[in-house]
């Protein structure tokens, strides 16, 4: 097996804000990756990821809608990420959680992120959990939303 196969990284949530920036970094640094969208991810594609040595799980929501809730997206898809890693023989998973996550949280968002972290911790995989605060950059949700509210004279 060649070195290039061992250096490929799987990414879920690659079209989101963090995912787009991560892909840009990988492209600039000639790092090989396989993108998995939320739709493809739900169909489980272990064969597609079999050449990956690591999986970065970025799929998540920060607000619930009538179509998506925290449990389904943040927790159940974390379980699928672990399952896909095991089926694909990927030993390392990286999970983006959130600053403020704890077992004592009262927020449904933070509770879902805590539960997803527990999925990673109890997976048997080598895991890394990041707990970023607001991530700000070009086209990020927070800055874009604030700019929109300023233009509408809401703030």
Regions found by a protein language model. Give the residues of each.
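NAD(P)-dependent short-chain dehydrogenase/reductase
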Residues: 133-155
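Conserved Rossmann-fold NAD(P)-dependent oxidoreductase catalytic core, especially the SDR/UDP-sugar
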Residues: 73-134
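Conserved beta-strand positions in the Rossmann-like core of class I SAM-dependent methyltransferases
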Residues: 10, 34, 128
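Conserved glycine-rich Rossmann-like NAD(P)H-binding loop of the short-chain dehydrogenase/reductase
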Residues: 31-39
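NAD(P)H-binding glycine-rich loop region in Rossmannoid oxidoreductase-like domains
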Residues: 40-88, 98-104
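Structural motif
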Residues: 8, 53-54, 92
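N-terminal Rossmann NAD(P)H-binding glycine-rich loop of SDR-like oxidoreductase domains
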Residues: 2-29
